[in-house]
């Protein structure tokens, strides 16, 4: 698909994509034909729920640095080339929250710029991109208003959030206006952790292995989801839909222990949740991306949550899995309908992609 500079020049003003310069990550995608993903002779629409970006003008409002270690800025042709090579038809763009400590006025300005730029870009290439809105969750009523505007006026398809808000849990009742608005709008929330920053401050995640990411990210997701279950947030907002990055962290693998605590230490639980924690994995409120690392891990996630709760994610531009579509196609034991749902069918329904 050739990309016209005239077509995207206006939309790209102020919008940058992050790329990864982690060394020998394989050859760059060649400018070739767009890969079409086929399952049993049927062309499948593929949707990547987990794709990063940033809006420089928004970051400049609070002097957030753009060139963090290990990142470079790619142009849209690079991104399209990688999508085409991998067989990804759509990316759902999201921005990891770096503004959760900003004052109200700065946060309002930042989010306005950010959401409008995302909407401009997606409008220029509606056949390849949709985007999650951003919001200043540290100011919950403002965040609810920002979300309403972003969805109703700008056409953004959901909301991206962190795994906590400046050290506060998402299950804190102060954030209820945001969950109420998301439920009212019927949109999907994409939750991406920010590396267990409060734990990182202790120094326990220092040293080799990039532990703030390697275990910090899935740990923060596990903590956030557990609080949303045990503090009753999912019960209070039964229409809430959350997709958790990185396969939902450790929760799907250890949810049975969360069930067991209800009977082992009943005096430490309640009055909510209304169901066993393992039921929340399957009951339609929680979704999980496919950033897992073996077919067996994916099969376990699907067993614990149900195939309808699992959605293709690539973590673009970070090369955790260089063949994300083939990763799904190669999982043994799935039906054709299962593969189609994971690759894009479920995400297309949640994000309103025709």
Give, region by region, the residue ranges found by the protein language model.
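Aromatic-lined glycan-binding groove of carbohydrate-active enzymes
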Residues: 229-283
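Hydrophobic faces of well-ordered beta-strands that scaffold small-molecule active sites
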Residues: 47-51, 91-93, 130-133, 159-161, ...
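Mid-to-C-terminal alpha-helical segments outside catalytic/metal-binding sites
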Residues: 2-45, 49, 56-63, 67-90, ...
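Aromatic-anchored helix/helix-loop segment that forms the rim or "lid"
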Residues: 216, 223, 266-299
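Short aromatic-enriched loop/helix-cap "lid" or pocket-rim segments at secondary-structure transitions
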Residues: 58-62, 106, 201-204, 254-258, ...
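Active-site gating/metal-coordination segments in enzymes
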Residues: 20, 89-232
């Amino acid at each position: 698909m050739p990309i016209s500079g005239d077509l995207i020049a206006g939309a790209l003003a102020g919008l940058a994509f992050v790329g990864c310069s982690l060394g020998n990550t394989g050859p760059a995608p060649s400018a070739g034909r767009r890969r079409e993903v086929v399952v049993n002779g049927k062309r499948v629409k593929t949707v990547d729920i987990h794709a990063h970006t940033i809006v420089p003008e928004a970051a400049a409002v609070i002097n957030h640095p753009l060139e963090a270690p290990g990142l470079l800025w790619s142009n849209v042709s690079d991104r399209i080339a990688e999508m085409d090579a991998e067989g990804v038809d759509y990316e759902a763009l999201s921005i990891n929250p770096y503004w959760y400590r900003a004052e109200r006025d700065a946060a309002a300005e930042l989010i306005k710029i950010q959401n409008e730029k995302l909407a401009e870009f997606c409008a220029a290439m509606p056949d390849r991109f949709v985007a999650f809105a951003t919001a200043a969750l540290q100011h919950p009523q403002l965040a609810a208003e920002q979300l309403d505007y972003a969805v109703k006026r700008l056409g953004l398809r959901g909301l991206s959030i962190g795994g906590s808000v400046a050290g506060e849990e998402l299950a804190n009742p102060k954030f209820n206006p945001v969950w109420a608005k998301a439920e009212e709008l019927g949109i999907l929330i994409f939750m991406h952790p920010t590396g267990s920053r409060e734990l990182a401050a202790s120094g326990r995640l220092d040293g080799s292995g990039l532990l703030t990411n390697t275990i910090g990210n899935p740990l923060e997701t596990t903590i956030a989801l557990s609080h949303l279950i045990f503090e009753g947030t999912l019960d209070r907002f039964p229409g809430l839909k959350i997709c958790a990055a990185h396969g939902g962290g450790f929760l799907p693998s250890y949810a049975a222990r969360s069930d067991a605590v209800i009977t082992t230490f009943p005096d430490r639980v309640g009055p909510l949740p209304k169901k066993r924690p393992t039921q929340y994995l399957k009951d339609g409120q929680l979704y999980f991306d496919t950033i897992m690392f073996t077919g067996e891990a994916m099969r376990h996630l699907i067993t614990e949550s149900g195939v309808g709760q699992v959605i293709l994610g690539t973590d673009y531009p970070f090369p955790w899995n260089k063949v994300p579509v083939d990763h799904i196609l190669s999982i043994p034991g799935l039906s054709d309908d299962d593969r189609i749902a994971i690759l894009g069918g479920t995400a297309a329904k949640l994000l309103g992609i025709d």
